[in-house]
Amino acid sequence: IATLMLVGCGLSDERAHTLKVYNWGDYIDEDLIAEFETWYEEQTGEPVTIIYQTFDINEVMLAKIENGHADFDVVCPSEYIIERMMRNEMLLPILTPEFEKEINDKNINYFDSVSPYIKEQFSLLEAPEGQDPNDYSVGYMWGTTGILYNEKYVTEEEALSWDLMFDKRLQDKIFVKDAFRDVYSPILVYAKTLEARQKGELGEDEMLPIETIRELMYDSSDESIALVESYLKRMKELVAGWEADFGKEMMTQEKAWINLMWSGDAVWAIEEATEVGVDLAYTVPEE
């Protein structure tokens, strides 16, 4: 989660008692909103109204904020969007002097319970000099990007490689998440892995070092963009559609057999599919 800069020089009394949240769909049970409003007033003696909106694509969310169409207090972007928001001075530190005093008085420390791994990952985000991403954002949810597949048509072994996304046998049965970063990075890593194997730099079953993979995730050179473009053009001939949220239903209804998907959506789809007798599974390709 990142805390957004508020627009304007001051807040009206009504706005001061309003919390605007911009989050991914399906992340919070909206019944909790009314419960939180009640709980907050019981705890503080102050009323609060939650205005809760959802989005399904990072770039749509960011454009809405950058264009001045929203003054959200809290948003939930992916890590690369946090980097962009910090560069554009769109975020405020989470710990204002007043808030820091309050949590110190109550002996609350977020970092006492946060996973060291998650804290490390936030520290690795690119930020303007002298700024720590951990001061502007806290972890909310994290997961992986991989392949959700129908076990009737695809084996686990097949799903362990991104080769599957280019299998002509699956033409018009493939859906891909409409999320730039989550498609670009895996395809680039896959392409570079094949390239290294062809050059003899890697064995047939060897993978790129983790340091190289991390570098590729941030590689937006013209050469890499052109390489990914060439692979996406091949994939385009096989893909039935690009989805932001409806891929889960397509898999559950067996209208798609594989879907490049986030792990959270995959778990939801697997549970729903089980109820109707469809066997789905999820894996992260080895590349």
Regions found by a protein language model. Name each.
Residues 5-8:
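C-terminal motif of bacterial Sec signal peptides marking the signal peptidase cleavage site
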Residues 11-88:
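Early extracytoplasmic/lumenal segment of secretory-pathway proteins
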Residues 22, 27-30, 84-250, 255, ...:
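Extracytoplasmic ligand-binding site segments that recognize negatively charged/polar headgroups
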Residues 49-53, 239-241, 281-283:
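General small-molecule cofactor/ligand-binding pocket signal
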Residues 72-77, 240, 257-262:
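Paired acidic/hydrophobic, glycine-rich loop segments that form the ligand-binding mouth/hinge
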Residues 79, 178, 263:
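Short secondary-structure boundary segments
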Residues 247-260, 265-266, 278-281:
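Conserved active-site beta-strand-loop modules that form the wall/rim of enzyme catalytic pockets
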Residues 273-287:
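Extracytoplasmic/periplasmic substrate-recognition and gating elements
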